[in-house]
A protein has these predicted regions:
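Flavin-dependent oxidoreductase catalytic cores
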Residues: 1-203
Length: 203
């Protein structure tokens, strides 16, 4: 469970996992039919794929648990199914929590390996976020905002390192609120894309 006050999730059967993988593919087809130009798979922030990836939340003892390769099986199967369901020319992105900020949890080294596997399967860009899978996370960064324990660009280093180590395109997120800051990230080669959310809503 996410916290000790939460109910313990039921372990999915292999058939249920297969059904969910197919559901992702079906959703991708609907997205194409609806006119979307990019598909992004959300593998971050405690969502289902993130729970499979994390050695903290994944307590399985079958082919979907244990080693990094096993824990990555569900998201990798999902990528394969979606990639096969959409046009070859359609960009496929994947969002990951590059670190859980928890000792013994998901970290940057595992994210780098996952990104290599995703690149091999046809993912075009990794959207590099972090955290969201444990209430015990401790962000080792300068704190600009005590309420969120974050600072401008605090996740950019993840995008930079994954890009450098794998060659895959990366997107940077996380308190990138000034145009000059965004341009600096791109000009330094720390990321290929800046994802903007709240600033568009504010303006």
């Amino acid at each position: 469970p996410f916290d000790e006050d939460y109910a313990i999730p039921a372990e999915l059967s292999k058939q249920e996992i297969s059904d969910i993988v197919q559901a992702f593919a079906n959703a991708a087809v609907r997205s194409v039919d609806a006119g979307y130009k990019v598909i992004e798979l959300h593998f971050a922030h405690g969502y289902l794929a993130c729970e499979f990836l994390s050695p903290i939340s994944n307590q399985r003892h079958d082919k979907y648990g244990g080693s990094l390769k096993n824990r990555a099986a569900f998201p990798l199967e999902t990528i394969t199914a979606v990639r096969n369901a959409i046009p070859e020319s359609m960009p496929l992105f994947a969002r990951v929590s590059a670190s859980e900020y928890v000792k013994g949890g998901w970290d940057l080294d595992q994210s780098i390996q996952l990104s290599k596997w995703m690149n091999d399967l046809g993912v075009d860009l990794v959207d590099c976020s972090s955290g969201g899978n444990s209430p015990n996370q401790l962000l080792p960064i300068p704190v600009a905002n005590p309420s969120t324990a974050t600072a401008p660009g605090y996740q950019v280093a993840f995008a930079s390192e994954i890009r450098k180590q794998t060659g895959i395109l990366t997107g940077a997120v996380g308190l990138i609120t000034e145009a000059q800051h965004a341009e600096e990230i791109l000009s330094k080669g720390d990321a290929d894309v800046i994802f903007v959310g709240r600033e568009l809503l504010r303006n």
